[in-house]
Each structure stands twice: as C-alpha cells, then as structure tokens.
Amino acid sequence: MQYEDENGVNEPSRRRLLKGIGALALAGSCPVAHAQKTQSAPGTLSPDARNEKQPFYGEHQAGILTPQQAAMMLVAFDVLASDKADLERLFRLLTQRFAFLTQGGAAPETPNPRLPPLDSGILGGYIAPDNLTITLSVGHSLFDERFGLAPQMPKKLQKMTRFPNDSLDAALCHGDVLLQICANTQDTVIHALRDIIKHTPDLLSVRWKREGFISDHAARSKGKETPINLLGFKDGTANPDSQNAKLMQKVVWVTADQQEPAWTIGGSYQAVRLIQFRVEFWDRTPLKEQQTIFGRDKQTGAPLGMLHEHDVPDYASDPEGKVIALDSHIRLANPRTAESESSLMLRRGYSYSLGVTNSGQLDMGLLFVCYQHDLEKGFLTVQKRLNGEALEEYVKPIGGGYFFALPGVKDANDYLGSALLRV
C-alpha cells in the first residue's frame, strides 16, 4: 500500500505511461460508426423497474437529488487527453454515452464477427435504462497546466489532504474526473462502466474504483426510508429535503451570487470519502456505548431521549450532554446552531463490502458522498467539528477526494462541461 503524502504522487509520469497504453487500445478498437446497424428492441418488456428512467437533460445532472438507487459505483479516472480540443472530444463523447445508456435502447449489432463486439452483451440485446444515472465531476488536477483551465477552477475546489484520523492510500485518492454511476441493479452499473471505458481508451484510464449498495427496500422507498449502514445505524436521517427546490438552491447548487466562475452555476461541490469500518470491534461493543457514540437509538433512529427518527434533538435543554453526549456524532456533525445552518450538505452514501484485509479482518465500510454549494462551509467545516469524536475508534478513512459536479446538459446540442471549455 502506498500512502498519500501531503504533496501527492507524481502525476505527469503516470499520465505519460497511460497515454501510450490508451493509444494502443484505440488502434485495436472498433470505430463507433460501425454501431449504425442495431438490433430491434423487443416488442414487449415487463413493466418493472428495468424501464424506470431519469431525465438526462436539465439544469442539473441527475444522480444528485435523485432518490438513491440500490447499486452504485465510484470510478476515478486520469485524463489522457493531450490538449483542450481533446478534452472537449472526451466530454462530448461522455455526454453521448450517458444520454444513450440512461435512456435505454437496442444494443448495437457487431457488423463483422471478426471484430470485437460493440457491446459487452451483459444486458442482452436490449439495454434497459434501469433508473441509471451517471454523474460527472472534475477534480482539482484537471485545472493544472495541461488544458489552460486554471483561471476557471471553482474557487473552493482543492486537493484532499489528511485529517488526523485518516490513513489515506495514494492509490485510492483524487482523480482528474470522477463518475458516480447508480442504477437499480449492479449489472446495469457494470455495463455502463464497461461501455464508457470501451469508447474512451485513448482519453481515460481508471485510477480507482469502488462499488456500493443500499438495501433494495430502502431504494424502492424513493427516499422515504433511510438506508442502514454496516454499523447498523440509519445513515442520512438529518439530510435536508431533496424535494424542496428552494432549500436545494441554498444547500446544494452553486448560484450566481457566490462569485464563482460563471460556468459553475448549477453545479455542486462533491466530497467523497472511502471509510473502512472496524466491524468486528464494533460488534463486540455494548449497545449502550454504540448509541451514545452516535447519539441515536439503534433500532428506531430517534435521537436519544426521543421517540421518532426525524424528531429534532433539543440540545438547549441538554447543555451538559446528559442525554445526548456532547461528543456524539449527531451533536458534533450538526449542533443545530445559527452558525451550523451554513454547513448543511446533502449526503448520498452507500455501504461497501470487499472481502478481507491483509490482517484477516472484514473489509467493509461506507462510500461517503455529499454535495454542497460551498466545500469549505459544508464538508470541511463539518469534518473539522468531528475530529476526535468517539466514532473514530471504529472507522478509518482510506481514500476519496474533492470534486466539482458539472452543471447539467441543456439539450441535445449541448454537452457536459461546455460552458467551462468555451471560456
């Protein structure tokens, strides 16, 4: 394991190596033009979740306010594009692939069996939308000297540095771009990733990948049921209402009054943290201690001393923390003061399970993702309040990064990142 230092790893040499590999892959791939001949879609398809779809065009990207789907993947890439024109080609191509994959259609037929197939085939002859969303974000490193974009970097975007409890693996950190791919089923998520990689061999190289999940019944509730994390507690109870457009404008979206570059309006700062849980240790911890650490009842999700999950804790009547400890997770994360109102963020986390670590412990945890209009006021402020909390004994952040989720695609003539690249 290579640990991340404050200055990061040597990126230019890595990119030069990957560009050579990508060029070889492109030389052996099939031209996209061969996809003109396609199979006909089946005449009937059972009216189930496979036909569910999210709008692709709009002011904002899907996958941020969208109710959480059951399956999720985070994939960070190094960009191999050599100049700004190449980067535009990449963003146009990604937009085309996202538009097709999220809306569904017939899988392309391979015109010559001696050539590689144009589709992986894992979804069969018809690619159902399956509630797929693909959200594109850009990292701090995309605004280096390669594309001349430095003056247009979002003002609060920065490289993720280590917090006191972090044990960051350099191989699991950062990225020029990040895809958050979500759908009702895992095979749709995997199909989307393979399609994107197949179409961009000379433009993208995978840097790191993690797959996550929430329970099917939580996903089917469309946000009405809070997912439970692998520590056994509800995760996201205190989220602001994503259906409240006025509130989301205040919490999630960058707006014109923030003195950000004009192209960022309608986008959102994204914080990603890969957090490993010490589940064996946690499972041997008394229930009372677990609940004290979180500040919530494990079964109901209610704040301690209250009855219902969404009851608002009354910290003013508990100044000494006799009911909800002063260092409990919920009290530190959101002390519910006038000052903490500005640090609200929209969480969209998923559990992960990867097997076992080198020490023989279960490799399980949380893919923490949150969106906010200001990274410093949102995630960074909250995380600083959480430094030293009792929960740190059971969790260990090992990777992730800070990104900016691009504004949406207006129509079929537009593409992701167009306002950025046209400056």
UniProtKB/Swiss-Prot annotation:
<feature type="signal peptide" description="Tat-type signal">
    <location>
        <begin position="1"/>
        <end position="35"/>
    </location>
</feature>
<dbReference type="GO" id="GO:0005829">
    <property type="term" value="C:cytosol"/>
</dbReference>
<comment type="similarity">
    <text>Belongs to the DyP-type peroxidase family. EfeB subfamily.</text>
</comment>
<keyword id="KW-0732">Signal</keyword>
<dbReference type="InterPro" id="IPR011008">
    <property type="entry name" value="Dimeric_a/b-barrel"/>
</dbReference>
<keyword id="KW-0575">Peroxidase</keyword>
<dbReference type="GO" id="GO:0046872">
    <property type="term" value="F:metal ion binding"/>
</dbReference>
<feature type="binding site" description="proximal binding residue">
    <location>
        <position position="329"/>
    </location>
    <ligand>
        <name>heme b</name>
    </ligand>
</feature>
<keyword id="KW-0456">Lyase</keyword>
<dbReference type="InterPro" id="IPR006314">
    <property type="entry name" value="Dyp_peroxidase"/>
</dbReference>
<dbReference type="GO" id="GO:0020037">
    <property type="term" value="F:heme binding"/>
</dbReference>
<dbReference type="InterPro" id="IPR048328">
    <property type="entry name" value="Dyp_perox_C"/>
</dbReference>
<keyword id="KW-0479">Metal-binding</keyword>
<keyword id="KW-0349">Heme</keyword>
<dbReference type="GO" id="GO:0042597">
    <property type="term" value="C:periplasmic space"/>
</dbReference>
<dbReference type="InterPro" id="IPR048327">
    <property type="entry name" value="Dyp_perox_N"/>
</dbReference>
<dbReference type="Pfam" id="PF20628">
    <property type="entry name" value="Dyp_perox_C"/>
</dbReference>
<dbReference type="Pfam" id="PF04261">
    <property type="entry name" value="Dyp_perox_N"/>
</dbReference>
<dbReference type="GO" id="GO:0004601">
    <property type="term" value="F:peroxidase activity"/>
</dbReference>
<dbReference type="GO" id="GO:0004325">
    <property type="term" value="F:ferrochelatase activity"/>
</dbReference>
<feature type="binding site">
    <location>
        <position position="347"/>
    </location>
    <ligand>
        <name>heme b</name>
    </ligand>
</feature>
<comment type="subunit">
    <text>Homodimer. Part of a ferrous iron transporter composed of EfeU, EfeO and EfeB.</text>
</comment>
<keyword id="KW-0560">Oxidoreductase</keyword>
<keyword id="KW-0408">Iron</keyword>
<comment type="function">
    <text>Involved in the recovery of exogenous heme iron. Extracts iron from heme while preserving the protoporphyrin ring intact.</text>
</comment>
<dbReference type="GO" id="GO:0033212">
    <property type="term" value="P:iron import into cell"/>
</dbReference>
<feature type="binding site">
    <location>
        <begin position="236"/>
        <end position="238"/>
    </location>
    <ligand>
        <name>heme b</name>
    </ligand>
</feature>
<keyword id="KW-0574">Periplasm</keyword>
<feature type="binding site">
    <location>
        <begin position="334"/>
        <end position="336"/>
    </location>
    <ligand>
        <name>heme b</name>
    </ligand>
</feature>
<dbReference type="InterPro" id="IPR006313">
    <property type="entry name" value="EfeB/EfeN"/>
</dbReference>
<dbReference type="InterPro" id="IPR006311">
    <property type="entry name" value="TAT_signal"/>
</dbReference>
<protein>
    <recommendedName>
        <fullName>Deferrochelatase</fullName>
        <ecNumber>4.98.1.1</ecNumber>
        <ecNumber>1.11.1.-</ecNumber>
    </recommendedName>
</protein>
